Each structure stands twice: as structure tokens, then as C-alpha cells.
């Protein structure tokens, strides 16, 4: 495979730094104590925009493939898009958002009870801890969601793991 073919085959939404756009809401959650609620809400808009872009991309990739019937094509496009919406919603938004939110909440609680840090310093410490946590949760959550979907939703529509398809 040539370098150009490798680049074309690479999933830009899951195998490049663009993947971190799906984690915009985690950044928002980490900054929750320092910013207005509208900023946190906007971070969710960015994350769901990423989910939508990846889902459209996966649907279009399936659409341009050759299928034996239009019914099969419609089914395959729908499955590709829905599978991506489910995967990205859980792996990029819901689970990591909850994880960072709770991590920051309990970090703040711990710092309040165990230190005498000024409020502003405590908030910045919690934010930094939340941001530092993000890179460590990406791959475990991605793997968990992949496995969970293989055991649940993908059995319903009888499709192999999307990332393992050719």
C-alpha cells in the first residue's frame, strides 16, 4: 500500500487528533467551575457536531460502495450511520463527559475538605486535574464501547465491528 493509499484509508475521525473534537465537552466539563454555563453547553454542541460529521462520513463511505440492490444499499448506509452515532455518542460524549464531570466534582470535594487552598486556586487545580485526565480515559472508553456494542446493538443489526470492516 502506498503512503497516499494509507492516508486515504485512515479514519480521520478516529485515528487522528481530530478525534479529540469529540472530547470538547470534557474540556467544557473540566472548565465548568471557571466558565459560564453557556460555555459548557457550547462544548457539547462541538462534540455532537463531531458525532454528526463522523456519522455522515461513515454513511457516505457506505453509500459510494457498490451494492446488489437499492434496498441493501439503504440498509447498509443506515446501519453505518446509526452505528457511528451510537458509538460516538457513548465513546465521545456521554461516558467521558460523565467521567470528567464526576472526577472534577469529587476532586473539588476532596480539595475543599483536605486543603485550605483559596477558592480560585482550588478551581484551577480541579480544572487542570480534569484536563490531565482526558488523555488517559480515551482508549479505555473507546475499547469498552466497542466491546459493548459488539455484544448488544451490533448483534441486533448483525454487523461486524465497523472498525474491523474492510
Curated annotation (Swiss-Prot):
The chain crosses the membrane at residues 33-53, 78-98, 125-145. Signal peptide: none annotated. It is found in: Mitochondrion inner membrane. Keywords: Apoptosis, Membrane, Mitochondrion, Mitochondrion inner membrane, Transmembrane, Transmembrane helix. GO terms for biological process: apoptotic process; mitochondrial fission. One of its GO terms (cellular component) is mitochondrial inner membrane. It is a multi-pass membrane protein. Coiled coil: none annotated. PANTHER family: MITOCHONDRIAL FISSION PROCESS PROTEIN 1. Belongs to the MTFP1 family. Involved in the mitochondrial division probably by regulating membrane fission. Loss-of-function leads to apoptosis. This is Mitochondrial fission process protein 1.
Amino acid at each position: 500500500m502506498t503512503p497516499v493509499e494509507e492516508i486515504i484509508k485512515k479514519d480521520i475521525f478516529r485515528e487522528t487528533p481530530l478525534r479529540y473534537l469529540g472530547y470538547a465537552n470534557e474540556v467544557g466539563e473540566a472548565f465548568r467551575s471557571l466558565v459560564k454555563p453557556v460555555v459548557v453547553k457550547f462544548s457539547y454542541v462541538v462534540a455532537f457536531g463531531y458525532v454528526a460529521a463522523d456519522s455522515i462520513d461513515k454513511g457516505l463511505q457506505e453509500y459510494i460502495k457498490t451494492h446488489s440492490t437499492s434496498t441493501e444499499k439503504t440498509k447498509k448506509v443506515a446501519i453505518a450511520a446509526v452505528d457511528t452515532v451510537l458509538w460516538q455518542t457513548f465513546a465521545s460524549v456521554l461516558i467521558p463527559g460523565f467521567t470528567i464531570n464526576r472526577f472534577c466534582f469529587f476532586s473539588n470535594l476532596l480539595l475543599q475538605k483536605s486543603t485550605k487552598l483559596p477558592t480560585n486556586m482550588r478551581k484551577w487545580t480541579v480544572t487542570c486535574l480534569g484536563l490531565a485526565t482526558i488523555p488517559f480515559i480515551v482508549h479505555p472508553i473507546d475499547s469498552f464501547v466497542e466491546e459493548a456494542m459488539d455484544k448488544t446493538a451490533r448483534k441486533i443489526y448483525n454487523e461486524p465491528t465497523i472498525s474491523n470492516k474492510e
